[in-house]
UniProtKB/Swiss-Prot annotation:
Short name of any one Pfam family annotated for the protein: ACPS
E.C. numbers: 2.7.8.7
Catalysis performed (reactions): apo-[ACP] + CoA = holo-[ACP] + adenosine 3',5'-bisphosphate + H(+)
Disulfide bridge partners, by residue number: none
The protein, known as: Holo-[acyl-carrier-protein] synthase
Job description of the protein: Transfers the 4'-phosphopantetheine moiety from coenzyme A to a Ser of acyl-carrier-protein.
Name of the encoding gene: acpS
Cofactors demanded by this protein: Mg(2+)
Keywords: Cytoplasm, Fatty acid biosynthesis, Fatty acid metabolism, Lipid biosynthesis, Lipid metabolism, Magnesium, Metal-binding, Transferase
Family in the record: Belongs to the P-Pant transferase superfamily. AcpS family.
Xref: NCBIfam families: acpS, pantethn_trn
Lineage: superkingdom: Bacteria
């Protein structure tokens, strides 16, 4: 049963500006594993990566119904890719999580659908 849906869209140029202080911003929103991947990227690919993770985490927090804040932080959520490149969202909550991330020249968008484990 679907228990939550969240979506977020972010302007890439907004993330690009925040990446000027690269490490501080990335430490605030990316887990250590995500930062390790990000440090290997440059230019527009880095911006897309960080924006996609930012949007995915915001979308998840909206699907849960809390937003980013006291109950859910950026560092409580990790986005990895499976062997085919599909993004997978990792959290400590007990939901089935469906995640989609997309980019254009100007935006990154992510959508999360949460299902309960019991059917």
């Amino acid at each position: 049963m679907i228990i939550g849906i969240g979506i977020d869209i972010i302007e890439l140029n907004r993330i690009e500006k925040m990446l000027d202080g690269k490490l501080k911003f990335m430490e605030r929103i990316l887990t250590e594993n995500e930062r390790n991947v990000a440090m290997e990227l440059k230019g527009s690919r880095l911006t897309e990566f960080v924006a996609g993770r930012f949007a995915a985490k915001e979308a998840y927090s909206k699907a849960v119904g809390t937003g980013i804040g006291k109950e859910v932080s950026f560092l409580d959520i990790e986005v990895k890719n499976d062997e085919r490149g599909k993004p997978i969202l990792i959290t400590s909550t007990e939901y089935i999580v469906h995640l989609s991330i997309s980019h254009s020249k100007e935006f990154a968008v992510a959508q999360v659908v949460l299902e309960s484990l019991s059917r």
